[in-house]
């Protein structure tokens, strides 16, 4: 037994765990890499445009990273309690533990940490996830947890979210997660369209897409709050303590980001009405950039050249070649050679 480190051969040792969710780590790494890349090329931009460009990049990457991160986060609804409870089935021994419950859009995460960690000759430090996303079966994962022999507090909380539990937590949170996740994916697509439009001379439509991005984020919060509010109170008792849940960091970050998107969209809409030249200067676009518009008389696209001439308050000289070509276009002459220059 000494060769095994005082550990029974049929018990596996403590596995090393990554300090955070791997999906969130990948998302954060991707956006940080993009930010570092943009910062590297920042010295190549001259003047005040450098500061405006950096502000746009940081804000845009922050919004996109938040939308993706909260979609995979397990901290939409959280709870934490310190309790004295039983540790294993068919054992009268009690332990002092910190129990954490994190509910996300795709499942629940349960943490169990002993205070102190070493109790009953064991290391009490568990972090178990149970998912209900598409393609995952919560009931199967709960059955595997029973076979694995997880501690009683973990199994007790996991059992409350099973489909057959009388609490009804599974159906409500699963439905809320599906609707909220769908709204966040639409918000992410609106964010992509906003970035495309803000790089083109259609800034006002980019502002509209920012408004849509914020509205869909708020819709995700609305669906999550409305669906979870329909749940009847189901006490989560651990020994003599009761675990209560409340909105977590992911919920409040989504709310703040959604309000930020709406504010930016409104500012762009007002700036487009009041100060269009300053708005174009902020996005490093010249006020003289040609923009195709629909003609009011014939319903066709106006050429940028003629649109600038028509909108100019000063009289402008039209080149002879342009004037003669217009005359030839209007006259119905059977011979093409008379209109050649």
From Swiss-Prot:
It comes from the Eukaryota. Residues 1-24, 73-183, 227-249 are extracellular. One of its GO terms (cellular component) is endoplasmic reticulum membrane. GO terms for biological process: hydrogen peroxide metabolic process; positive regulation of hydrogen peroxide biosynthetic process; positive regulation of neuron differentiation; positive regulation of reactive oxygen species metabolic process; protein transport; regulation of inflammatory response; regulation of thyroid hormone generation. Residues 46-51, 205, 271-341 are cytoplasmic. May be required for the maturation and the transport from the endoplasmic reticulum to the plasma membrane of functional DUOX1. This is Dual oxidase maturation factor 1. It comes from Mus musculus (Mouse).
């Amino acid at each position: 037994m000494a060769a095994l480190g005082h550990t029974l051969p049929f018990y596996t040792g403590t596995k090393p765990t990554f300090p955070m969710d791997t999906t969130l780590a990948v998302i954060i790494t991707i956006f940080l890499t993009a930010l570092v890349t943009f910062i590297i090329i920042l010295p190549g931009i001259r003047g005040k445009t450098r500061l405006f460009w950096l502000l746009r990049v940081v804000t845009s990457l922050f919004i996109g990273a938040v939308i993706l991160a909260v979609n995979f986060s397990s901290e939409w609804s959280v709870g934490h309690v310190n309790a004295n409870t039983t540790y294993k089935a068919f054992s009268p021994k009690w332990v002092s533990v910190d129990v954490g419950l994190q509910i996300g859009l795709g499942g629940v995460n349960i943490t169990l940490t002993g205070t102190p960690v070493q109790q009953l000759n064991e290391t009490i430090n568990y972090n178990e996830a149970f998912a209900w996303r598409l393609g995952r079966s919560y009931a199967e994962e709960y059955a595997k947890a029973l076979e694995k022999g997880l501690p009683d507090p973990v199994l007790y909380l996991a059992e409350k979210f099973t489909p057959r539990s009388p609490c009804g937590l599974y159906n409500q949170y699963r439905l809320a997660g599906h609707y909220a996740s769908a709204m966040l994916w639409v918000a992410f697509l609106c964010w992509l369209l906003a970035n495309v439009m803000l790089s083109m001379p259609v800034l006002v439509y980019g502002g509209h897409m920012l408004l849509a991005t914020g509205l869909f984020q708020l819709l995700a919060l609305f669906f999550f709050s409305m669906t979870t509010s329909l749940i009847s109170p189901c006490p989560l008792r651990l020994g003599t303590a009761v675990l209560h849940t409340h909105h977590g960091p992911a919920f409040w970050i989504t709310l703040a980001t959604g309000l930020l998107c709406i504010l930016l969209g409104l500012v762009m809409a007002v700036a487009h009405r009041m100060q269009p030249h300053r708005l174009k200067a902020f996005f490093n676009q010249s006020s003289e950039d040609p923009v195709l518009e629909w003609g009011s008389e014939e319903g066709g696209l106006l050429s940028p050249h003629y649109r600038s001439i028509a909108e100019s308050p000063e009289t402008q000289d039209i080149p002879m070649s342009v004037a003669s070509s217009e005359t030839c276009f209007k006259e119905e002459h059977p011979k093409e050679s008379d209109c050649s220059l």
